[in-house]
Amino acid sequence: MAIRQLSETLINQIAAGEVIERPASAAKELIENALDAGATRIEIATSGGGKALLRVSDNGSGMDAADLELAVRRHCTSKISETLEDIRTLGFRGEALPSIGSVARLSIASRRRDSAGGHEIAVAGGKIAHLRPAAANPGTIVEVRDLFFATPARLKFLKTEKAEAGAITEIVKRMAIAFPAVRFVLSGSDRTTLEFPATGDDHLGRMAQVLGKEFRDNAIALDAVREEIALTGFAGVPTFNRGNSAHQYAFVNGRPVQDKLILSAIRGAYAETIPSGRYPVAVLSITLDPALVDVNVHPAKSDVRFRDPGLVRGLIVGAIREALARDGSRAATTGASDMLRSFRPGFPPNSQRPQTAWSAETSSSRPYQPATGFGERPQASFDGLSMPTARAEPQFSPQPAAAEPNARYPLGAARAQIHANYIVAQTEDGLVIVDQHAAHERLVFEAMRKALHSKRLASQVLLIPEIVDIPEEDCDRLMQHAAELSELGLAIERFGPGAIAVRETPAMLGEVDAHGLIRQLADEIAEWDTASGLSAKLEYVAATMACHGSVRSGRRLRPEEMNALLREMEVTPGSGQCNHGRPTYIELKLSDIERLFGRS
């Protein structure tokens, strides 16, 4: 069979197969064109999930008749001329409009700002139907109908209308985050589904619009520079995490990307702070010389290739970890919100209050006795947390008492320990509930990690070695890494078949559950690649040791111990979450407490 030149229409349809995969792909290309035209207002309307109708209107620079005719031809563009090494626009190939026109019914109405009138061009199945004058406002309106009517086989690969509409919504969100100075409106068949007013330079305000106020309340600002690359954005605190990676947004020179290198760097930065199966929330913007990044490596321009990927990864990991360390003990606010939603009033409306020993109905002659802490400050008996009975006559001071010094700390002053596991502390504007085991586990881990890096991890010799019985293959694995474990202060040796003797443990752990620790370490080492050694996993091993050497649930603490724990949390990086990524404390504001009692 002889080789022959393909028709222009078929060439465009082939290109459309790569560039226009679904309605969301068309929406992305049209929004990019609007942004490149300098638009400050972009409206997107859809019907049938974008398959029946996709309309993008903008107030950009507009086009005249000559521009319109060229715009629907392949590789005609105003954005580049001779080189791909200085791309400063979102689009640059000149493929989007001809590709869309080859598989759909396309019409474009446009008018330049300095022109008295506009023009309209229509393309169907790759053929220009007409080009004529038309009434139009300054800017451009692109209307795509019956997407893939010319290639019906493609329709079989599309998802439901709801799924396709959801994909368009996600595209609009990403563009809105990248361009806060632009107003975006997305409407469906019968209603406006999204509206993001312009926020100017207020990037966090735009993120609150798109990602919700919870992200704004739990975000840490990023601002770092390494050589010629700048990183800005916001990263959520580790305890503010999600069940998938859909809430990770990355932008390179303003271009939304889903680059594997960037997403991998985000995971690496949070590796020790969130549990397996959970994903951080982050918005990263990387700015660099266009010559240092290749954006022409993917048909949809969703991937990029950096000239120095190691530098970019190091910048991301370092910036996020530094920000998390800077905010130290901060935890997500969502825990308190969840707690508030779970609260119910003590007595439902219109219900009869149960008769109790303290109710007015059964104790009308009984003198009023205030609850402990109202009439008289209690003297806590730590072991049982028993409180003396308050005096019958409440003693109220006409002037509010000065706040105790401890209450002025971020995590407040310890007031009680409940269920031998949770510390209740009073702050200046609310209260904090701390999980003592999770908090101490994080503190121990950070201390071990610091000592490990400084090569000053001391060990304590056990008076009587602990003998742990485990399977022979686990013994072999542990002994293979005995030298590396000794760096963490854990000295082990063989004690006959199927047994390990623990001679020394890290001094900072105090009393250690050696049996549980050895068994868990054996399981973890079996799960890892034993041939690679533990050098890259020492911090994970330290986290395991910290868990087994922390204050256990059920241990009663003295008030001074509780306050000491709170003070140490305030100065320890990452103390807002334990080594497994769970929160170590929940804060409840006074305004939230008042709302529970209907005071607000």
Swiss-Prot record:
Q: Which Gene3D superfamilies match?
A: 3.30.230.10, Histidine kinase-like ATPase, C-terminal domain, MutL, C-terminal domain, dimerisation subdomain, MutL, C-terminal domain, regulatory subdomain
List the GO cellular component terms: mismatch repair complex
GO terms for MF: ATP binding; ATP hydrolysis activity; ATP-dependent DNA damage sensor activity; mismatched DNA binding
- Annotated region (Disordered), positions in chain: 327-405
Q: Which SMART domains has this protein been placed in? A: DNA_mis_repair (SM01340), MutL_C (SM00853)
Q: Which domain of life is it from?
A: Bacteria
Keywords assigned: DNA damage, DNA repair
Disulfide-bonded cysteine pairs: these are: none
Stretches of Polar residues bias are at 349-367
Q: Which InterPro entries match?
A: DNA_mismatch_repair_CS, DNA_mismatch_repair_MutL, DNA_mismatch_S5_2-like, HATPase_C_sf, MutL/Mlh/PMS, MutL/Mlh/Pms-like, MutL_C, MutL_C_dimsub
Record keyword DNA-binding present: no
> What job does this protein perform?
This protein is involved in the repair of mismatches in DNA. It is required for dam-dependent methyl-directed DNA mismatch repair. May act as a 'molecular matchmaker', a protein that promotes the formation of a stable complex between two or more DNA-binding proteins in an ATP-dependent manner without itself being part of a final effector complex.
Give the family from UniProt: Belongs to the DNA mismatch repair MutL/HexB family.
Q: What is this protein called?
A: DNA mismatch repair protein MutL
* Originating species: Rhizobium johnstonii (strain DSM 114642 / LMG 32736 / 3841)
For this protein's source organism, the top of the classification is: Bacteria, Pseudomonadati, Pseudomonadota, Alphaproteobacteria, Hyphomicrobiales
